[in-house]
Amino acid sequence: EEDFEQVVQTNLNGAFYMIKHTCRQFIKNRRGRIINISSVTGVMGNAGQANYASAKAGLIGLTKSVARELAGRNITCNAVAPGFVATDMTAAMPQKILESAVAQVPLGRMGTAEEIAQTVAFLCSDAAGYITGQVLCVDGGLSM
């Protein structure tokens, strides 16, 4: 129970409070971009990760609600949902588990931090000004 609450506090409540405090300036400026980092686990679920999946699914709900609330003020809110990304954490995983996970990805590889960052940068740009309330799964096709 404590682990569940800690994961929700970090991944959902943390985003809520960040949005709450940054929105004041966005509203004042009549412009803003909010990009939440969710996960394909929040879209698909994953055995053994009920706490994380719940928090990330909740973040998607928060994203969509905030997008509706703030759209009239020229503030967009979207979420990026990374799939399997090459990080120090994934590098520490046993090779067999890593290979099994990558085998589920239609593109046949893990994503990179740069690919996630480029997606976030796009959503922050003027080119994404007509995109709000969306979840962009950057997952090599895993969630399709």
Label each residue range with its predicted role.
Residues 19, 55, 63:
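Active-site helix of classical SDR
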Residues 44-50, 72-73, 108, 126:
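Active-site loop immediately N-terminal to the catalytic Tyr-X3-Lys motif
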Residues 24, 68-72, 129:
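Alpha-helical segment proximal to the catalytic Tyr-Lys
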Residues 21-33, 73:
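A short helix-coil junction within the Rossmann-fold of NAD(P)-dependent oxidoreductases
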Residues 3-8, 90, 101:
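Substrate-binding pocket helix/loop in short-chain dehydrogenase/reductase
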Residues 39:
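Residue(s) in the substrate-gating loop at a strand-loop-helix junction
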Residues 79, 102-127, 131, 138-140:
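C-terminal helical subdomain
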